[in-house]
Every structure is written in structure tokens, then in C-alpha cells.
């Protein structure tokens, strides 16, 4: 799952 700001998320992987 993409979980970095560029993907619109800010969760930890």
C-alpha cells in the first residue's frame, strides 16, 4: 500500500 505524502497519505508503512 502507498503510504507516503505523494499518494495523499501520511501513515507509517
Curated annotation (Swiss-Prot):
Disulfide pairings: 2-7, 3-13
Residues with the Cysteine amide modification: 13
Main location: secreted
Reported tissue expression: Expressed by the venom duct.
UniProt subcellular location: Secreted
Gene Ontology terms: cellular component: extracellular region; host cell postsynaptic membrane
Keyword match Secreted: yes
Superkingdom, taxonomy of origin: Eukaryota
Protein keywords: Acetylcholine receptor inhibiting toxin, Amidation, Disulfide bond, Ion channel impairing toxin, Neurotoxin, Postsynaptic neurotoxin, Secreted, Toxin
UniProt key word Transit peptide: no
InterPro entries for the chain: Conotoxin_a-typ_CS
A GO MF label: acetylcholine receptor inhibitor activity
Family: Belongs to the conotoxin A superfamily.
Notes concerning its domains: The cysteine framework is I (CC-C-C). Alpha3/5 pattern.
Role: Alpha-conotoxins act on postsynaptic membranes, they bind to the nicotinic acetylcholine receptors (nAChR) and thus inhibit them.
Protein name from the UniProt record: Alpha-conotoxin GII
Annotated source species: Conus geographus (Geography cone)
Amino acid at each position: 500500500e502507498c503510504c507516503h505524502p505523494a499518494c495523499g497519505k501520511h501513515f507509517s508503512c
